[in-house]
Amino acid sequence: MTTLTITRPDDWHVHLRDGDVLADTVRDISRYNGRALIMPNTVPPVTTTEMALAYRERIMAAQPQAHFEPLMALYLTDNTSPEEIRKAKASGKVVAAKLYPAGATTNSDSGVTSAKNIYPVLQAMQEVGMLLLVHGEVTTHEVDIFDREKTFLDTVLAPIVNDFPQLKIVLEHITTADAVTFVQQAGDNVAATITAHHLLFNRNHMLVGGIRPHFYCLPILKRATHQHALVAAATSGSKKFFLGTDSAPHAKGRKEAACGCAGSYTAHAALELYAEVFEKEGKLENLEAFASFNGPDFYGLPRNQETVTLTKQAWPVAESMPFGSDIVVPIRAGENIEWTVK
């Protein structure tokens, strides 16, 4: 039986939501991850240090595994102040701030309307060493949804990278060959997370033979050529790419609807899904760097000391999973996953 032992991984981009669902989402994310960076687009969004610390307490109250530490992020708005950034940095619990272009994704209506509005904040982040996390899509109606990422790179991110050369930036959940190239050509202060579902699927999986709402996420799945570029980047061993699931649960009825929500739930089996991709590419030896080394190295945090073991042993995913008083349909529901984590 094939086994692979790696340093305990981290998830550098996950949505846990809030309220009674935390018991379920925290259970899944803490099963084998050492740390997870918790996204702040809750309702209301986590816009202050006090809100971030209170949210962290609610996460810890949901009784994660003892080895797990939640890392917090601030939600940037047009009104975020440099003083708030300094306060967040001083807390020792908030490690990043997130740029959501207004209206780009779930609960992002309070986001930034123009990057220029937060330039004083970005300057403060550069000064104190706080990372900028970026949802890389424009939201103007004239830009096709499949082109939102490339347009963002050209019109928004490139100027930020140029104007703040010492600011560490993570381009989150990249979905295009254009983003891969952008990150590869940028300096060492620019990196990217890649999700399991963008490695495993392309837009055909979502649209051919009927609409499959559980594959609907933002940024949206792209054509296969972009998927192949993401797989090549993730499995390459490059230190610029690391694991961020963007696991984003919604209740089944919110997904299977006339106007369904964006987000795919993968926290139930994230490392196992990534292992399938790396095995298919013949690059299992690079999984540890992607899952366990590149993220903490970029964030300036120590690597985890413990290990986890993956075993090539298939197991069936449930058709649905508990989600507070409701249920969530996970990726690969009713199908087998080829790897098991012990």
UniProtKB/Swiss-Prot annotation:
Residues the entry annotates as binding substrate: H15, L16, R17, N41, H135, L218, H250, A262
Keywords, ordered alphabetically: Hydrolase, Metal-binding, Pyrimidine biosynthesis, Zinc
InterPro entries per UniProt: Amidohydro-rel, DHOdimr, Dihydroorotase_CS, Metal_Hydrolase
Cofactor: Zn(2+)
Reaction catalyzed: (S)-dihydroorotate + H2O = N-carbamoyl-L-aspartate + H(+)
Coiled-coil segments: none
Molecular function terms, GO-annotated: dihydroorotase activity; zinc ion binding
Cofactor stoichiometry and binding remark: Binds 2 Zn(2+) ions per subunit.
Pathway(s) where this gene product acts: Pyrimidine metabolism; UMP biosynthesis via de novo pathway; (S)-dihydroorotate from bicarbonate: step 3/3
Amino-acid positions noted as binding Zn(2+) 2 in the UniProt annotation, renumbered to this chain: K98, H135, H173
Top-rank lineage group of the source organism: Bacteria
Keyword Hydrolase: yes
Binding positions for Zn(2+) 1 per the UniProt entry: H13, H15, K98, D246
Family matches, as SUPFAM superfamilies: Metallo-dependent hydrolases
Chain's role: Catalyzes the reversible cyclization of carbamoyl aspartate to dihydroorotate.
Summary of subunit composition and partner proteins: Homodimer.
Family in the record: Belongs to the metallo-dependent hydrolases superfamily. DHOase family. Class II DHOase subfamily.
NCBIfam families: pyrC_dimer
Listed name of the protein: Dihydroorotase
Gene assigned in the entry: pyrC
